[in-house]
Amino acid sequence: MDNYRRLHTPVALCVASPPAPPTTSWKSMEGLVQCSANHVPLSPITFLERSSKAYRDNTSLVYGSVRYTWAQTHHRCLKLASALTTHLGISPGDVVATFSYNLPEIYELHFAVPMAGGILCTLNARNDSAMVSTLLAHSEAKLIFVEPQLLETARAALDLLAQKDIKPPTLVLLTDSESFTSSSYDHYNHLLANGSDDFEIRRPKNEWDPISINYTSGTTARPKAVVYSHRGAYLNSIATVLLHGMGTTSVYLWSVPMFHCNGWCFPWGAAAQGATNICIRKVSPKAIFDNIHLHKVTHFGAAPTVLNMIVNSPEGNLHTPLPHKVEVMTGGSPPPPKVIARMEEMGFQVNHIYGLTETCGPAANCVCKPEWDALQPEERYALKARQGLNHLAMEEMDVRDPVTMESVRADGATIGEVMFRGNTVMSGYFKDLKATEEAFEGGWFRSGDLGVKHEDGYIQLKDRKKDVVISGGENISTVEVETVLYSHEAVLEAAVVARPDKLWGETPCAFVTLKEGFDNDVSADQIIKFCRDRLPHYMAPKTVVFEELPKTSTGKIQKYILKEKAMAMGSLS
């Protein structure tokens, strides 16, 4: 059984009542039919063909001195899709992996691979050779596109596969440089030269066909293979650009890795609206400010840790106020209100979004209300830090009791699990039926996030299930403790985890990175007192460790590493 068929193995997952079949609802409506005239499988690859005509000469993509129009991007993707099928033998359902940062070629592969009928699998560019080898074996990738700077890691990964008698994928280099003349590898530009722009796109026969596989970020140390459908990617792409007001004149800076949730589906969304893409390989405050001024960037996305870097960077003082409106979409963890406040003081418009790899990225956003402008800053930014309402393409989002599946009271206090139901939820975990069934138990996707629902219907996260500290029988939200820590003038970054305790079971342990210049001015006792003055005493950290925090490639703090460190400390009592 090939990959495509295996991905489509039917699974009985949801115990909720299924919708009635069309024949039942149409009994009294004679003359209605579903046919190719009124039902075409949804796929985001259709956006590119339209943009090549509607925005033909508009700039589609910029990377340093490289610049393409939408007509050129469409032409290149057709030729690449042709070469994938005729030169490299890609068949429908074959997996094509990438191992690279945000280069123009990765953007093009988001179209070319599904145009050839393949399934795109973008691997985290920070993975080591052992992880790359594991993911290539699991996904059964037939090809892997690699940028030159990561070639040695990729080679080592392929060697590991060969040692296990697993056929490694064909490696294609993302370069036309003369310094890489080895005949051992195909080159991206050679493929383009051998492709034909007369290629007939392999459109999905079913909109539920897989378009991509995304491995979860690794904050749990065990990545899972999340499968996106053409339908889900199509709907999420359109919803995201509409919610954030992106149009033909918008300029999107690629600060979110395309290997993370397919870049929140923005490769396809930008094409839908004919927006301009600015690619950068490495993210830094300087790169962000430079591109805002050079290319008049209007939108970019970033984790709260990246926003924290921006507000604490010297570039922030040099380049603000901004010359024009720039919207920042932030997600990945609850943003500290203080960071949102500082970003907006600098001239950024912060839009808080929330989602998971399993929801194609964005699944909710905090819609700001005009009446919030009249509130005191502290209250206003606290409201903006909430996760908000369901995304435009997500039919339902709720906080429910995970046992009874009843919706919790909208009182801002009753904690339940955040759950989703909609067309942008993943198809499932590839090769992990048990995990898929657990995630969909009860007819909803269970996020694993704990939250509350306020009177206005807005949802607010309190913690991940696995991150809650249980001390003396009391549940402590690490998010609430971290919010207080971020309000300290000397704290650059903070994360709270559980430390084992013989008397209390667990106690809060805070890992803190101090701002430059404060290293010798702040002690652990001072941090603890600061928290005790602002929180119930049982919630205040009992341990404070000063060090740099480990992060994923998207800037999310890897709490599992900190938990291991706290566990190794042993009991405080």
Swiss-Prot record:
Major place of residence: cytoplasm
Enzyme class: ligase
Biological pathway: Secondary metabolite biosynthesis
InterPro entries per UniProt: AMP-bd_C, AMP-bd_C_sf, AMP-dep_synth/lig_dom, ANL_N_sf
Tissue-wise expression: Restricted to glandular trichomes (lupulin glands).
Pfam families listed in its UniProt record: AMP-binding (PF00501), AMP-binding_C (PF13193)
Single GO MF descriptor: CoA-ligase activity
Subcellular location(s) per record: Cytoplasm, Cytosol
Entry GO terms, CC: cytosol
Catalytic activity field: 3-methylbutanoate + ATP + CoA = 3-methylbutanoyl-CoA + AMP + diphosphate; butanoate + ATP + CoA = butanoyl-CoA + AMP + diphosphate; hexanoate + ATP + CoA = hexanoyl-CoA + AMP + diphosphate; pentanoate + ATP + CoA = pentanoyl-CoA + AMP + diphosphate
Region (SBD2): 353-429
Binding sites annotated in the UniProt record for ATP: 216-224, 352-357, 449, 461-464, 556
Physiological role: Involved in the biosynthesis of prenylated phenolics natural products which contribute to the bitter taste of beer and display broad biological activities. Catalyzes the ligation of CoA on isovalerate to produce 3-methylbutanoyl-CoA. Can also use butanoate, hexanoate, pentanoate, 3-methylpentanoate and 4-methylpentanoate as substrates with a lower efficiency.
UniProt protein name: Isovalerate--CoA ligase CCL2
